[in-house]
Amino acid sequence: MPRNLFPLLYLVVLLAASHARAADPLDDYLSLDLQELLSLEVTSVARKKQRISESAAAIFVITRDDIRRSGVTSIPEALRLAPGIQVARIDANKWAISSRGFASQFANKLLVLIDGRSVYTSTYAGVYWEVQDVLLEDIDRIEVIRGPGSTIWGANAVNGVINIITRPATESVGTLVSVGAGNEEQLVALRQGFALDQGGAGRVYAKFNRRESSYSPDLNGEAGDDWDKTQMGFRVDLALSEQDSLTLQGDAYQANENQVLREFILDPADPANLPPDPQHPFLIPFLPDAFESEGYNLLMRWVRDAGDRQNNLQVYFDHSDRQEQVLRQRVDTFDIDFTQNIKLGRRNELVWGLGYRRIGDDFDNTFRTIFYQDPQIQELYNLFVQDEFAWREDLKLTAGIKWEHNDYTGTETQPSLRLLWAQDARHAWWLAASRAVRTPSRLETNSSIAAYQLPPDPADPVYYPSPGVVRLEGNPETKSETLNAFELGYRWHLDEGISLDLTLFHNRYSDLVTFEATGSLSFQVPNPLNPGEWFYPPNSLTYDNLRDATSQGAELSLDWQAHENWRLRANYSWLDLSADVDDNSTDAFGDTVLKGSSARYQWSLRSQHSITPELSMDLWIQHVDALSRSGFSRPRSIPAHTRFNLRMAWQKDDLELSLVAFNLLKDRHSEFGAENIFVYTDVERSVLATLRWDF
């Protein structure tokens, strides 16, 4: 994406602002009672519109007003608002986000969508969170499903689905200018919305944000992970007829990111790599890495609503280009998806759909990371059907199944069965049993990674005279990881303005990926993943599926409208995760990291208080239990920590001025270990002042 396009779009937005129309006032969800909030419609559970109270799934909605009043400036930070979602900042531009365990930078059991467009990367099996962005003011809601959603959304929707849904362009006619500055972050955003003929509308936006470097205990100072990103985009909504509507939208971004690599392994065959350390001659203790990432996407959605039948056709293309020292990659994704919703009488409703996805990737191989079969094309085909049958007015049964074919493991089957009982106007119960799979990534099937370097053998310099590198080799026979999940949910609502949402779950995982040795050397060396321990290093490692796991837990959210201008919300989640490795496995460290990276419990409390029509105050406190071994390549024990944020805002007509203080309790704290080979970092206290003009 040429850089000169970004300032050009800024100019276009500024010129368009001179023709601004009046904008709708900010939504005030405090004016809604809890019954109305429970009646908010969601679409991610069943690929159709339904109220939260009618959903047989553990779903939570983060509203636009929740995001605004929290003061957060990114999608990852907004996800801290949801119960059962573990969000940990690894450094200034990386996060570990997961649902119901298995936290890591690339949490491979969580599917993330933006307006139905998957941002899950098949390279690592996860999400590059720092480049997943939209204009936060244009988000309508974030639908967070905890638990499997694979019958509807396919493979990798194992432990949860996050769908970030933006507002129609008809709801953003007018001009928005937002500017923020603080000791850790600076941002500016511009958006112009305009009306079109026959009830249509469009908008364009541009935004820039920069985050300063965090603190690194490894470096005893700045972590060298500062970054900035420029993004622009558009959306057009057209009413083609009384039944047909068309949406066109797209985004483009360019990010300049920095990171410091710890113990980076150089190519010993390269004469330019001089040996600074006789014991580790090709190992650089700290290597700064400045790189660019850029990408764009285009999406088209056509909807025909004929009353008892609705058709939905969505097509998108996504391009990303990422040039790190660790891995240089370019990925293109084309996806087409068709869904039809049919009402079969008064009690029966059928949803079915089919889809095709083509992923093309290309890598610049380095000594550290090699991809075989480069470039490669992957193709996926899927078909699903789901039927909802109302036995009685208060009892609904939903049964569905999805077939999906991929190039790695062939055809995968993912069924689900859900039952909802609306006991009365105040009480509702639901049950669910589901099967979901996580398909292997490109990395796990046909790659080679320089995992760590070994020192020479002091006892036998003839047999092993020089340092060696242990490589992790991909395995084309890697199987899909499988989950069988069982859930029980309960919702309770009182007229006095109190609601409760409780979910219990039991998950059984099989064929989880392990790291297996292919032979071992004759001498012991320090274990790079467990300091203080020694082990016989392998000649090389490879992937296999020799681990099973079990988890159970509870997730609770409480909502109390204490007064017409004061609302309290509390969340609590508890998780117990255990794993068993096959007797034939040589994986010596996976279980420790698997269990140690997920918080056993966490809780939060939020207070939203509109003191006067112009002045509001929001308090948010969150506590996360200790992590015994978080991060894979460089695990780290993380003490329990408590975050406390305070936001004060003054609003007059179209103008809002806010001041947010983040992490008030401590100067800095740790949240996660180091993924890959990055240095440890801490999250620091920060303040941010924002001025927003929406007219």
Where do the PLM segments sit?
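Extracytoplasmic beta-strand/coil segments of soluble accessory domains associated
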Residues: T43-F60, P76-S118, D140
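Short acidic/polar hinge/loop motifs at secondary-structure boundaries
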Residues: S118-R146
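Periplasmic-side early beta-strands and strand-to-turn transitions of outer-membrane beta-barrels
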Residues: T151, N163, T170-S172, R191-F291, ...
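Conserved C-terminal beta-signal and adjacent last beta-strands/turns
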Residues: G193-A195, A239, L431, V593-F695
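Face-selective signature of the C-terminal outer-membrane beta-barrel domain
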Residues: A239-A255, L287-T411, L420-D424, I498-L504, ...
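Structural signature of Gram-negative outer-membrane beta-barrels, strongest in the C-terminal barrel
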Residues: S241, R347, D374-S510, Q608-E614, ...
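Membrane-embedded beta-barrel scaffold of Gram-negative outer-membrane proteins
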Residues: D308-Q323, A422, A428-W430, V462-P465, ...
